């Protein structure tokens, strides 16, 4: 039996992977086996960190709102503000409240003082 060279198909597959890993450092962008492993690892990390990204931002928003409210009054906290917002049916999500805490504190103070009364 004669030997068949798998040139075209294998080369096309490897160049596709090489294009993906071209920005990686060291052997991760040069050696085929490590390129494949690093591509799998990169795609897995991207998938995992999409949810982690959302989680981190929500945590940041909660922290910003809580810090801004506690500056205003000592006996008032984030959880009571959110609870009162739901009771009054004010549709302000955490992202908007965090932006108010940074850009327009007076507006946030007005909202939180309205909730206390």
From Swiss-Prot:
The lineage of its organism: Eukaryota, Viridiplantae, Streptophyta, Embryophyta, Tracheophyta. GO terms for biological process: ribosomal large subunit assembly; translation. InterPro entries: Ribosomal_bL20, RIBOSOMAL_L20_CS, Ribosomal_protein_bL20_C. It is found in: Plastid, Chloroplast. Keywords: Chloroplast, Plastid, Ribonucleoprotein, Ribosomal protein, RNA-binding, rRNA-binding. GO terms for molecular function: rRNA binding; structural constituent of ribosome. One of its GO terms (cellular component) is ribosome. This is Large ribosomal subunit protein bL20c. It comes from Populus trichocarpa. Coiled coil: none annotated. Binds directly to 23S ribosomal RNA and is necessary for the in vitro assembly process of the 50S ribosomal subunit. It is not involved in the protein synthesizing functions of that subunit. The keyword Phosphoprotein does not apply. Its main location: plastid.
């Amino acid at each position: 039996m004669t030997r068949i060279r798998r040139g075209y198909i294998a080369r096309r597959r490897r160049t596709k992977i090489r294009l993906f890993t071209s920005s990686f450092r060291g052997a991760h962008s040069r050696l085929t086996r490590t390129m494949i492993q690093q591509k799998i690892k990169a795609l897995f990390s991207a998938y995992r960190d999409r949810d982690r990204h959302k989680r981190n931002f929500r945590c940041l928003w909660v922290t910003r709102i809580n810090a801004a409210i506690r500056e205003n009054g000592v006996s008032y906290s984030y959880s009571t503000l959110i609870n009162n917002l739901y009771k009054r049916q004010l549709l302000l999500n955490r992202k908007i409240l965090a932006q108010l805490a940074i850009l327009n504190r007076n507006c946030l103070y007005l909202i939180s003082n309205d909730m206390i009364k």
